[in-house]
Amino acid sequence: RLRAHDVFPAAWVPDLLMKRKEDPEAMWSFFSPHKFPELHELYGEEFEARYEELEALGEFEFQLPAIKVWRHILSNLFETGHPWITFKDESNRRNPQSHVGVIHHSNLCTEITLNTSKEETAVCNLGSINLAVVMSGDNPLEKLRTAVRLAIRNLDSVIDVNYYPSERAKLSNLRHRPIGLGVMGYYEWLVKQGVDFESDQHLEQADALFEAISYFAIEASADLAQELGSYPSFEGSKWSQGILPIDTAKKMEDGKPFFDRPRRFDWEALREKVKKGMRNSNIMAIAPTATISNIAGTTQCTEVPFLLQFYKTNLGGVYKVIDPSVRHVGTNYHLLKEAFYVDQLWIIKAAAVRQKWICQSQSTNLFAKQGTTGRDLDLIYTEAHRKGLKTTYYLRGQSATKDSASAKDDVIEALKSAVAQGATLSDAEAHQQAKLCSIFEPDCESCQ
């Protein structure tokens, strides 16, 4: 019984499988990658044409009903958390760098979607903006623009001073200069505004926010290109043609992107600027931020808290952590959510809204509480594909012996008690003191 403990499998799912699984009579053909390696290099209509040509010639090794293949993927996902479901065609169709290669897979956390080849190993430098801080107080949009522009410049600078473990990694990073700007504190930001995660108001806020981040990030990279020059493989890219991430967003039945709304910024003027040059081939990706968000004292990336109250162990010992969003709730207890008790379709909808504006992808976990069925999972992942997500991350299952509702109840009871006494949960209890990193501190939590 062999185990590959450091292998994290993902399913690189083409549109064709998602179509065929809807037909109980449709078959799925398995081909040898050694005989037909071109299938891994093709996507979209070209992939389907070659795939069906090989099927007609009988070149497959064996066949299974497409729905059986899909159910097998979902069963393994439910039992083990793997394989992560990622979508091959959507990732490649929206690839700004489709003129110089193909995306063969994501990174481990599924937010990075970059070309790879025998000559190049993809590298991406990541950073995350703390929305709970930046989007607070006066002039939040101006503060956001300042933060985004600074982050883009700094991430670009890392490319030139970085240590590269291989020449293939160095070649790739210097040729394409990809970066991945993301966020953390998203859920805390929503709670501070009094916005329910499971609401259309959330989608409206998310759309407006990520339009702004996308605009500011693209603008910053285009301005850097005028100052420092475009990345070497710019010519022929979607950027060079004035095609922006929002232009390639998947269209719904009405011919418009999901949750389409009037634009707030002058995208035509930006499009003309982008045609003249971009400093970076890719600029946005939402990483998990599991550790750095704890250090910053905010919620992880774009996620609903796994638990509102838990105990954490590190080099400093064991201590109780109460989710930082709790301190903003007041008496609006309905705003408090835990991931297992959120309708997962709201997670999909919110991710779809954000994905329109993002050139790479997002680390999007999904959560299966006790009683989740195969039909439920089919609906969730089919909807993720239909709404244009490029990737999903873990499917986290709930322990049969542990119900986190009690943790939420404990927090709410503490809040009610505090309110009754004319107070709120203290910052010391509701918010861990943010720690500043220092290269001179060998025990810094971010390095563990």
Each predicted region: which residue ranges?
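Acidic, low-complexity intrinsically disordered tails
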Residues: 405-448
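Conserved phosphate/anionic-ligand binding catalytic regions in large, soluble enzymes, centered on
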Residues: 1, 73-128, 175-191, 278-308, ...
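Core structural elements
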Residues: 42-43, 152-158, 172-194
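Catalytic or ion-translocation cores adjacent to nucleophile or general acid/base/metal-coordination motifs
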Residues: 1-19, 203-209, 303-320
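Active-site cavity-forming subdomains of large catalytic enzyme subunits
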Residues: 1-128, 133-136, 140-141, 164-171, ...
